[in-house]
């Protein structure tokens, strides 16, 4: 899954890394939507995802990721439970101009124990922060990766996905070992 706040670059990231033509459900922002959606900081945004984005990328032979980009607005969160079924992990795309928009996605993945990385989309003109400062501001669990990226750049997006796969692999292994350790008792 690729999640994050409104205008953080989720559609852009899925489109940049997908090796197939991405499925997009973009619609023009309406006047009615402007009353509901906070467009502060993303004034140039003219479209929004109304269902999901879908793409696919092969990380290496035998490992393809199906990418589901979530809508950024609260009113579409009911879709997240369906999109997260069977998820290996997630990317929370962050815009430092609206960092507070990440909290719902961070909370969602933490609550469901879905491994995730935070990818800070480095918009031009936005202040750049150190990864540890972003982790502290988002109150992330120790070890949750934070990476800087450019969602428009395929190589940068692929690096984010590789970090997510590596982290998810470590988390799944740790949980497996934990469950095996808990199941073993004295003989």
Where are the regions a protein language model picked out?
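A general structural detector for well-ordered alpha-helical segments in enzyme core domains, enriched
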Residues: 105-108, 133-134
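Canonical P-loop GTPase G-domain recognition
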Residues: 124-179, 187
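Inter-motif core of Ras-like GTPase G domains
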Residues: 73-98, 107-112
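A short helix->loop->beta-strand "cap" motif at the edges of active sites that frequently abuts
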Residues: 112-115, 143
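Conserved beta-strand segments of the P-loop GTPase G domain that flank and frequently precede/overlap
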Residues: 67-70, 90-96, 118-122, 148-150
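Short secondary-structure boundary/capping elements
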Residues: 49, 71-76, 97-101, 129
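Conserved G1/Walker A P-loop phosphate-binding module
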Residues: 1-46, 55-66
């Amino acid at each position: 899954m690729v999640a994050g706040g409104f205008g953080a670059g989720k559609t852009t990231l899925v489109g940049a890394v997908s090796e197939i033509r991405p499925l997009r459900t973009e619609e023009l922002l309406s006047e009615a939507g402007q009353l509901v959606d906070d467009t502060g900081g993303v004034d140039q945004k003219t479209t929004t995802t109304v269902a999901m984005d879908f793409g696919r990328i092969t990380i290496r032979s035998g490992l393809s990721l199906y990418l589901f980009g979530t809508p950024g607005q609260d009113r579409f969160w009911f879709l997240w439970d369906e999109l997260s079924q069977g998820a290996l992990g997630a990317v929370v795309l962050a815009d430092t101009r609206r960092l507070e928009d990440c909290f719902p996605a961070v909370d969602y993945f933490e609550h469901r124990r879905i491994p995730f990385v935070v990818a800070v989309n480095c918009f031009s003109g936005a202040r750049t922060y150190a990864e540890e400062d972003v982790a502290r501001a988002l109150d992330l669990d120790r070890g949750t990766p934070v990476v800087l990226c450019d969602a428009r750049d395929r190589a940068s997006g692929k690096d984010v996905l590789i970090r997510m796969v590596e982290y998810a692999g470590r988390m799944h292994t740790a949980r497996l070992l934990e469950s095996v350790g808990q199941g073993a008792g004295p003989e």
